[in-house]
Amino acid sequence: VKTVAISQRVDAYPDRGEVRDALDQKLANLISMAGFLPLPVPNEIAMCKRSDAKELSGLKVWLSEIKPNVILLSGGNNVGDCKPRDATETGLCEFAELNRLPVLGICRGMQMMGVLDGGTMTSVEGHVLSQHKLSGEIVGTVNSYHDYSLAECPKSYRPLAFSEDGELEAMRHCQLPWEGWMWHPEREDEFQARDIDRMRELFKS
């Protein structure tokens, strides 16, 4: 079974003195239903140096030991709001590029992929708690939960889908098996065959 390393959102609880990594259980369920093994990635290890690993960060040590087959950048948090998470996802993308692993970015995950490629973010209206009809290579109706979008398709990617108001909703890397989706496939009442089939195709590439 192929393993999928999944980045996690960061939630702070100052009254308890805790900062927690969090992952929607439905996302792990979706990955399992698609036939893969989900492996959540701890965020703070990206900021730590292992005393027994010289210059390697804790994330690099984790990746070298776990050896995931696929990287998934999940939703939640805004890009730039949480340094440990940004560092984790930057390291995951570097590892994926070096090893030519498939990457799927969901919502914030797609935004992070775009920003790492030199893209910029812009605020949008009407994209929170709404539905959009897609046009392009991917069609259908999808959910929407984001306040920001990529201002344009990053240079290393090609667009796969747009919303009715012209915002980029999906993209594919021109050289690597990487895709970004702005919708949340895990938040559907029933998982969509379209999303599961596309996930399987991407993860097996």
Language-model segments: which ranges?
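DNA-recognition element of transcription regulators
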Residues: 144-148
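N-terminal beta1-alpha1 cap of cysteine-dependent amidohydrolase-like domains
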Residues: 1-108, 115-116, 122, 127-135, ...
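Catalytic His-Asp charge-relay segment
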Residues: 177-181
